[in-house]
Swiss-Prot record:
Multidomain protein; including a starter unit:ACP transacylase (SAT) that selects the starter unit; a ketosynthase (KS) that catalyzes repeated decarboxylative condensation to elongate the polyketide backbone; a malonyl-CoA:ACP transacylase (MAT) that selects and transfers the extender unit malonyl-CoA; a product template (PT) domain that controls the immediate cyclization regioselectivity of the reactive polyketide backbone; and an acyl-carrier protein (ACP) that serves as the tether of the growing and completed polyketide via its phosphopantetheinyl arm. Residues 931-1251 are annotated as: Malonyl-CoA:ACP transacylase (MAT) domain. Keywords: Acyltransferase, Multifunctional enzyme, Phosphopantetheine, Phosphoprotein, Transferase. Binds 1 phosphopantetheine covalently. This is Non-reducing polyketide synthase nscA. Residues 1720-1797 form the Carrier domain. Disulfide bonds: none annotated. It comes from Arthroderma gypseum (strain ATCC MYA-4604 / CBS 118893) (Microsporum gypseum). Residues 1698-1709 have a biased composition (Low complexity). Residues 17-256 are annotated as: N-terminal acylcarrier protein transacylase domain (SAT).
């Protein structure tokens, strides 16, 4: 630091005025550079801190924060709104300022130069926290660490302030931001304070919610308070009303409020700083107080944070003092320093004032003042960026599952197989293929296998289709690999306790799937025998992962990898890489292989891969190749820190994973020792591990001569070198699972990994059984001397205390790839003692079928019988919080294992179990909170909740602090039970009840309960109004306390009483009136609880007389234990004051309906909620019964509604049941019962009723004490879905000779005589011209030669389809024509064609000589400079126009100068992207397409005529492309702008969507329904050259739609643009439906051959062809031209059918139309439809019950299209496919058919 320099660093409380997203983006980019290591460290630490703090939030708040990998990701989120606004804004400001501060130093590459004597830190509000991080630092590295803790404090401060403030005034339910502070200028602090004092006095404002001064200086005063009260204060005071004032951007609550916060609040926020910053750490730099203008006196960190917290929460800001403090600093150093510098983050109004004052003070002195902006550096370019580092997290494998040969259908069976040394070798099962015909050991039979051996999984076709929402037909067509990938993924997640969304690492958007697969046997063989609707999604590899992501709603990446034999382990390595890269937080990975195709056997055998003698003989001298094997395996992987935070069971830790390639091998299939060794070194370096420390290696070990020799060499050289030698205690054990279960090919690597994980679990290396004779002589001879060898017997592998065992897993691919994983032991988890203080525990089981639920219950019962030591708390945690819950449910709350066993046996022994079990409703029932009154009070209510749950405790404490600040006593001793009896105090009694109820309501929300309505009984109505947002929590406490105090002061204790009577009001009146002694007794009805429960009140003696009289008539009466008669005349003395107090309380519209016992109705708005309402509620009858009846009448509640009694004891529960006997009511607390047990029982009831409680929050307080149990896996309700390979056609195809017959091209008429106006506008039928408007109607004939030629230049499905450029030319033609009529002197007309929407495609009829008219209607209005257009079809004979248009658009007449200005700003960006594409093409990273190739790709959907083919070359990179365009010189007609020119410059977007490999063009085609705008700066020129550029992207609002902007350039300038052109994805199955000529029916393909009788396999009908080759199929299309292309199109999920025909065999070889009359009477239409649905879906008719939903049956949008076509074709029943959405269940569908068909 310059010795002559004094320095002040100012940390403001406002963001810089720059684009914040850009600042954070630049900060992030710089953090990747090696130059900015400390900046990166700070951002990473801040990310960790924020994730840690967010994880501690209650889930409703946690859900508001999107998943983020870095705090900078949050810069794109609008963090200034919502409940987290204050926290996010505070923390992000702290991050920005400290990030800029650190980056400034590193950008300038200067050392820490802050000299304490010459450096002063200053700041305002949150800025002081950032400054504190610097004040405590002696180096820049310290700032990085301390800064993260400043971020933590900032976040906590924001959370705390927002929470407290929300209790003072309820935030707006619509998200509207209201300021909590206004600044007043030109008034003194004293005069403003006088006005505020007057307002607070006049309005009886409570101290807690008073309006106050939070900041002041000479020129301004800041006034703060709840927004409504601040507004009221300015309206109340004429002086303030007419003062100069502005609202400040303070939207989240109050700081600087000494009346609101105390030391306990400050401690709650700042005590976190001690977690990293030592409390005794010295303060290094002076930090100025914004209140006193003097440096804080603190000497240590803890004192400093305490002072800062006190100032932020309770201190007033005095800017003049800040300025004076800065001047004083400069004055003290003025003699030694001649330069004064103020560093800041941009400037602000406050900072400019400080600058001016300081410079003015030193104006006469010879000092140089410098201003330094700490933000400027971020905009600099520091040259090429050097990557900082790779991620260094360890990874944890937390779950696994398998289906492996030899019956190893779970991990226990797999281990048993290994432990017993079993060999799973068999011959090929008959369900795969017939060895009698396909096996020839001589090799003479073409396409036959020379080996009969393999290793196969049991029951590969068995699958629970219903669980995965698949129809039997879809399940049958789906590859067993895909099915078992789903199953094992679920089982692995079940073992891992993964519940998507439970923790940040398991958020669905952060979970990805990675599977290895190297064959397509099912698709190529079994399913190809009869290709059906689900052939593609059931057989294509990508759908294996896609199904997992789609079913579980994971939106992370899904990759299906093929690296031959190493695919499975390579998929795991890819998953690890994604985790290390931060792309995901959880990965599900595995390998898949199910063998069915004899072709692959033949191919591998002919290539000499396979052994002809049997199993893989790993390291045996007779090794002669590998033996094929099935295998399915899945693992779940997380980063280690996430797994530990999630309380997972860690099976092993991944230290490193690498893949390379044997590029130098002698042949592509030959292994290479050098490459293998290089891969080992890489993975060891990655982990920093000594190879000598590795003690177990699971070899690739295939049992081939070359493979075994090379791997043994590479392993021994690296892991057991000659020198340094391994010590005797460093034995390297080797194993090879292929000797047991064969070579699983794509699943081989995952099988090896599963074995290694089991070795870790079992602490034993199983025996190697691969050496059948003697060891292979090619293996190094000195292995024993090197202390390495195969484990020839089961060998213990104990874990040594203080050390971690290291293991390596190898998997090599036949193509040359090598993958290696390095593993170590899981961390030793020491669980905290679990004292099981909770006396009741929830145990939950669920399934998707009754059979599975029963089996799950039986397996749990069996587990408990075998493990009687099972900890009930762990079992509850596992089954409740760590399981996905399904619609068939069992649940119970028990206190011991025997009770659970009894409950399970009771259910299982019930013979009516199957009929009594019902699935939960598809829609969760509504929930009503019922708040009890004072009568439920007792000491210790909620004691256990207060002790156990920090969230509940914090809510009670915060509400209690509000009560104390309002002058009322603390209620905590009542709630936690530390005082025994305080019922004599009405204030304490009523406040404790209301505070308890508000806290309970918030606790229920934390537990995942979504509230539909509230109702309060008497005192409980205050809590209900607070929870509904009508009044704030602070106001509820204030009013209840005031009301109670008035009662104590104005009402006589014990003079009145209340009596509960078991009779109606009328019955009581009649009985009393009939008695001579009771007729004159006066009483009042206080409460009508039910129709037979009434509470009356009055004078004590008279109530006693009434009780005696009624009891004499056998009427049950109960005298209530209350000191006053509420809701009677005894309350009259308090009413006026109560209303006066309530008059100053703001009332809001309820956020949820309020059921009013006063008004006997439901309240939805604020009109009837006011001070008078509370007055009446205190005095008038509580008509609880009428309120419930009204809610029933209004449909707000019904018999399915769940009611939660919120209060100390369930009083309202009985009242609700009295009104709705069948209703479900649960309690929050119960007298003489543990409140946690009560909540637990209630949660179980809610769970069984169909709600989804947040079990994670229920177990969260003690989660670290619980263990995740390894319980029996889900029991599947399986059916065998297997398509057997029939015949010998894989052999026969070697002898088949195929011929082809070319299709005859369609001939076009090219004549185009025209005497009409233009080629597209043929006749004007109406024209109206007025002064400023014009209307025009035209008619055109699409069969006219010019028009027809334009259409035929753009053909789809061999049909001419009108391109959008046709409508563009027509619009421009009519637009210029009308505009010039109204503005004849205009020189040029520039038009913007906007809002183009084409609802129906226009397809040219193939009937020549006919008329195909269309009408164009246009209306131009000069007042808006726009013209509306509509296109209509018309009748060919009458010319009558259709009622609805098929297309609309608007032409806007605009100034092209604005276009030029807009495009000038964009031109360099577009050119940059074009240059980047060109460079990528040069590098081979993008595809350069010639004109022929580009239009050949286009023919995938569209065939363009030559005139339309203007693109000379294209560079295509996924969804981004550019094209060089030359327009044809001929206009070919009369146009405004020829359509073929428009298409040439714009149809690049269509090529991207229909030709890019980024689009699924095999299953779909893409059509454009329109665009937002189309502009051309100048008219297109014949023969001119242009360039087009586009980047398409998926639209968030519609997953089936893409959009993008097409830029048209001439030279370097943009001369045109198609804005937001949209393309909709449409299944190719529907090509005929949407693009067929209006008058034709086409039959494609020959008739199918005659087939033999159908065979049936497990209920699925199969066609058996008479010849062994697959049969061709027939497609019949009968579609009209006008087919919807826009949002009304029911686009199916990605599935494609080769034919819409059923797989059911037909007796006739030709297609015949449906008969005119059904074979059955019309009354049987429903049964016919049901049978057809059963046939097409593969379900039994009995399964189509009335309550079965189409989603559950697997009827998706594609199947609904197929069914609607079948209904029409076979039954003559016209049903739209959308009806399956409108009638979502079988019952609704059949009712519709009965009604309308």
């Amino acid at each position: 630091m310059d010795s002559a320099l004094q320095r002040v660093i100012f940390f403001g409380n406002e963001f810089p005025s720059d684009d914040l997203k850009d600042l954070f983006r630049r900060l992030y980019q710089h953090s990747k550079d090696r130059r900015f290591r400390l900046l990166s460290a700070f951002l990473e630490e801040s990310t960790t801190v924020l994730k840690d703090e967010i994880a501690k939030l209650p889930w409703p708040l946690k859900e508001l924060v999107p998943p983020f990998n870095s705090v900078l990701d949050l810069a794109d989120v609008d963090f200034r709104q919502g409940p987290l606004g204050a926290a996010m804004e505070s923390s992000m400001l702290t991050i920005l300022e400290l990030g800029m501060f650190i980056g400034h130093y590193q950008a300038e590459d200067v050392e820490w130069d802050l000299i304490p004597e010459r450096t002063l830190l200053a700041g305002l509000s949150i800025g002081i926290l950032a400054a504190a991080a610097v004040a405590l630092s002696s180096s820049l590295a310290d700032v990085s660490k301390n800064g993260a803790e400043a971020v933590r404090v900032s976040f906590r401060l924001g959370i705390y302030v927002a929470d407290i403030s929300s209790k003072l005034e309820t935030p707006q339910s619509d998200g509207t931001l209201k300021s909590w502070a206004h600044v007043v200028t030109e008034m003194t602090q004293a005069s403003v304070q006088d006005e505020l004092n007057q307002f607070n006095t006049d309005t009886h404002s409570p101290e807690l919610t008073k309006v106050f001064i939070s900041a002041a200086d000479k020129t301004s005063v800041s006034v703060s308070g709840p927004p409504s009260r601040v507004k009221a204060a300015f309206q109340h005071s004429p002086i303030l009303r007419y003062s100069k004032s502005l609202p400040l951007p303070v939207y989240d609550g109050l700081c600087h409020a000494s009346h609101l916060y105390t030391r306990s609040d400050i401690d709650a926020i700042i005590n976190c700083a001690e977690s990293v910053i030592k409390p005794d750490r010295s303060v290094r730099l002076a930090l100025l107080s914004s209140q006193t203008g003097k440096p804080f006196v603190a000497k240590a960190a803890s004192e400093l944070f305490l002072e800062i917290g006190t100032e932020l929460l309770t201190g007033t800001i005095y800017l003049d003092n800040v300025t004076a403090g800065i001047i004083e600093h400069f004055k003290l150093q003025s003699e030694a320093a001649t330069k004064c510098r103020i560093d800041s983050f941009r400037t602000s109004l406050v900072l400019r004032g400080i600058h001016s004052a300081v410079e003015a003070h030193f104006a006469e002195e010879q000092q140089q003042f410098i201003r330094c902006d700490l933000v400027c550096w971020v905009h600099k370019d520091f040259g090429p960026r050097q990557p900082r580092s790779h991620a260094s997290s360890k990874l944890a494998i937390v779950g696994m599952a398998c289906r492996l040969p030899g019956g190893a259908n779970d991990l226990d069976l797999f281990w048993k197989l290994l432990e017993d040394g079993r060999d799973t070798l068999t011959t090929v099962p008959v369900d795969r293929f017939d060895l009698n015909t396909h096996y020839d050991p001589t090799g003479k039979t073409e396409n036959a296998t020379q080996t009969p051996y393999g290793n196969f999984i049991d029951r590969p076709g068995y699958f629970d289709a219903g669980f995965f929402n698949m129809s039997p037909r879809e399940a049958e067509q789906t590859d067993p690999m895909q099915r078992l990938a789903l199953v094992t993924a679920y089982e692995a997640m079940e073992m891992a306790g993964v519940v998507p969304g439970r923790t940040p690492s398991t958020h669905p958007s952060r979970i990805g799937t990675f599977y290895g697969q190297a064959s397509d046997d099912w698709r190529e063989l079994n399913a190809s025998q009869n290709i059906s609707t689900y052939a593609v999604p059931g057989g294509e590899r990508a759908f294996a992962n896609g199904r997992i992501n789609y079913f579980f709603k994971f939106s992370g990446p899904s990759f299906n990898l093929d690296t031959a034999c190493s695919s499975g382990l390579a998929a795991v390595q890819a998953a690890c890489s994604a985790l290390w890269a931060g792309e995901i937080d959880t990965a599900i990975a595995g390998g898949l292989n199910v063998i069915t195709d004899p072709d692959n056997y033949c191919g591998l055998g002919n290539a000499h891969f396979l052994s002809k003698t049997g199993q893989c003989k790993v390291w045996d001298k007779d090794a002669d190749g590998y033996c094929r094997a099935d295998g399915i395996g899945s693992v779940v992987i997380k980063r280690l820190e996430d797994a530990e935070a999630d309380n997972d069971n860690i099976l092993a830790v991944v230290l490193g994973a690498c893949t390379n390639h044997s590029a130098e091998a002698i042949s592509i299939t030959h292994p290479h020792a050098g490459a293998q060794k290089a891969n080992y070194r890489q993975v060891l370096h990655q982990a920093g591990v000594n190879p000598i420390d590795v003690s177990y290696i699971e070899l690739h070990g295939t049992g081939t001569q070359a493979g075994d020799a090379v791997e043994s060499e590479s392993v021994s050289d690296i892991f057991a070198p000659v020198t340094p030698r391994r010590r005797p205690d460093q034995r390297l054990h080797l194993g090879a699972v292929k000797s047991n279960i064969g070579h699983g090919e794509a699943a081989a690597g995952i099988a090896s990994l599963l074995k290694a994980l089991l070795v870790y679990q079992k602490n034993m290396i199983p025996m190697h059984i691969g050496i059948k004779s003697e060891i292979n002589p090619t293996i190094p001879k000195d292995l024993e001397r090197r202390n390495v060898g195969l484990a020839m017997q089961n060998t213990p592998w104990p874990r040594v205390e203080g050390k971690k065992r290291l293991a390596v897993v190898n998997s090599f691919g036949a193509h040359g790839g090598n993958t290696t994983l390095l593993l170590e032991d899981a961390p030793e988890m020491v669980k905290a003692q679990n004292p099981e203080d909770r006396i009741t525990h929830s145990v939950l089981l669920s399934a998707k079928s009754k059979k599975s639920l029963q089996a799950n219950m039986e397996s749990l019962l069996s587990y408990l019988d075998q493990h009687p030591e099972t900890n009930l708390a762990d079992l509850a945690y596992t089954t409740s919080s760590r399981r996905m819950h399904h619609n068939m449910r069992f649940g119970t709350a028990v206190s011991c294992i025997p009770a659970l066993q009894k409950a399970l046996r009771s259910q299982l022994d019930n013979t009516n179990f199957a009929s009594e079990v019902r699935p939960i409703p598809n829609e969760a029932p509504s929930v009503v909170l019922a708040f009890t009154g004072q009568g439920a009070y007792y000491s210790g209510m909620g004691r256990e909740l207060f002790s156990e749950f920090p969230y509940f405790r914090s809510q009670v404490q915060q509400l209690d602090q509000l009560a104390q600040r309002l002058g009322f006593p603390s209620v905590v001793p009542v709630i936690d039970g530390s005082i025994e009896d305080s019922s004599k105090s009405t204030i304490l009694t009523q406040l404790s009840v209301v505070i308890l109820e508000i806290a309970l309501a918030r606790f229920w929300s934390l537990l995942g309960v979504s509230i539909s309505a509230v109702i309060g009984h008497s005192l409980g109505e205050y809590a209900a109004l607070a929870v509904a947002g009508v009044i704030s929590a602070a106001d509820a406490i204030y009013l209840v306390g005031r009301r109670a105090r008035l009662v104590e002061e104005r009402c006589t204790l014990g003079s009145h009483s209340m009596l509960s009577v078991r009779a109606s009001e009328d019955a009581i009146q009649q009985m009393l009136a009939s008695g001579p002694d009771t007729a004159a007794i006066e009483y009042e009805v206080s409460c009508c609880n039910t129709n037979q429960d009434t509470v009356i009140g009055g004078l004590k003696d008279e109530i006693n007389d009434i009780r005696k009289a009624l009891e004499a008539k056998s009427i049950k009466c109960t005298l209530l234990d209350v000191p006053y008669a509420f809701h009677t005349a005894q309350m009259d003395p308090i009413l006026d004051d109560l209303e006066a107090f309530a008059a100053h309380v703001p009332f809001n519209a309820p956020s949820i309906p309020v059921l009013s016992p006063l008004l006997a109705t439901a309240i939805f708005d604020v009109k009837s909620l006011n001070a008078n309402y509370l007055r009446r509620a205190a005095r008038e009858t509580v008509d609880f019964a009428a309120a419930i009846e009204a809610a029933q009448d209004m449909g707000l509640v019904d018999s399915k509604t769940v009611w939660i009694d919120v209060g100390p004891h369930p009083i309202c529960a009985g009242l609700v049941r009295g009104m709705i006997p069948s209703v479900s009511v649960v309690s929050s607390c119960r007298r003489n019962e543990d409140s946690i047990a009560t909540i637990c029982k209630s949660l179980v009831t809610l769970h069984l009723a169909g709600l989804t409680p947040c079990w994670a929050e229920f177990f969260k307080p003690r989660e670290c004490e619980y263990s995740l149990l390894h319980l029996p896996k889900y029991r599947w309700n399986e059916t065998n879905y297997w398509i057997p390979y029939i015949g010998t056609w894989t052999l026969d195809k070697a002898h088949l000779k195929h011929g082809t017959k070319p299709m005859t091209p369609f001939s076009l008429s090219m004549s185009r005589p025209s005497a009409l106006r233009t080629s597209l506008i043929h006749q004007i039928t109406a024209e109206t011209i007025e002064s400023t408007t014009a209307t025009l109607h035209t008619i055109s004939d699409m069969q006219h030669p010019d028009f027809l030629e334009a259409i035929q230049g753009h053909t789809m499905n061999k049909c001419g389809v009108a391109t959008s450029s046709i409508w563009s030319d027509m619009a421009f033609t009519v637009g210029e024509y009308l505009y010039r009529l109204l503005m004849p002197n205009v020189k040029d007309v520039h038009m913007n064609l906007t809002d183009v929407e084409v609802l129906h495609a226009q397809v040219a009829s193939k009937t020549r000589g006919s008329i195909q008219p269309l009408v164009l209607q246009a209306h131009l209005d000069l007042s808006t400079n726009s013209m509306c257009l509509s296109w209509f079809n018309a009748d060919g004979e009458t010319g009558e126009c259709a009622a609805e248009s098929f297309a609309t658009a608007t032409v806007r007449f605009e100034d092209p100068a604005a276009w030029k200005k807009e495009w000038a700003r964009l031109a360099h960006l577009v050119r940059g992207r074009i240059e980047a594409l060109e460079q990528r093409a040069v590098e081979g990273k993008a595809s350069r397409l010639s004109k022929p190739l580009a239009y050949a790709l286009f023919k995938n959907v569209v065939d363009y005529a030559d005139r339309y083919r203007g693109m000379d070359s294209v560079v295509l990179d996924e969804l981004e492309a550019m094209a060089e365009v030359t327009l044809v010189p001929e206009r070919h007609g009369t146009w405004h702008t020829p359509p073929h020119w428009i298409d040439s410059v714009s149809h690049l977007a269509g090529l991207v969507m229909n030709g890019s490999d980024a689009s699924n063009t095999r299953d779909y085609f893409f059509v454009t329904p329109g665009c937002d705008s189309f502009r051309l700066l100048n008219k297109l020129e014949p023969g001119a050259q242009y360039r087009s550029y586009v980047r398409m992207f998926p639209l968030l609002e519609d997953p089936n739609m893409h959009g993008g902007d097409v830029y048209i350039l001439q030279g370097e300038e943009i001369v045109g643009m198609v804005g937001m052109i949209r393309f909709r994805r449409v299944p190719r199955l529907l090509m005929d439906r949407f693009f067929s000529p209006p008058t034709t029916t086409s039959v494609v393909g020959p008739a199918p051959p005659v087939v033999s009788a159908a065979t049936k396999t497990h209920g699925i009908t199969q066609s058996v062809p008479e010849i062994s080759a697959p049969s061709p199929s027939i497609v019949v299309s009968d579609s009209t031209a006008n087919n919807t292309l826009t949002d009304k199109l029911p686009v199916p999920v990605p599935r494609l059918a080769s034919s819409s025909e059923s797989s059911t065999p037909k007796e006739s070889p030709i297609a015949t139309p449906p008969e005119s009359e059904s074979a059955e009477p019309l009354g049987n239409t429903v049964s016919q439809c049901l049978r057809l649905m059963a046939r097409e879906t593969g379900l039994e008719v009995e399964a189509l019950t009335g309550d079965a939903s189409f989603v559950q049956l697997g009827v998706d949008s594609l199947m609904s299209l197929v069914l609607s076509e079948k209904f029409r074709a076979e039954l003559g029943v016209e049903i739209k496919s959308s009806l399956f959405l409108e009638c979502p269940t079988i019952g609704e569908m059949t009712a519709w058919i009965e009604e309308y068909c």
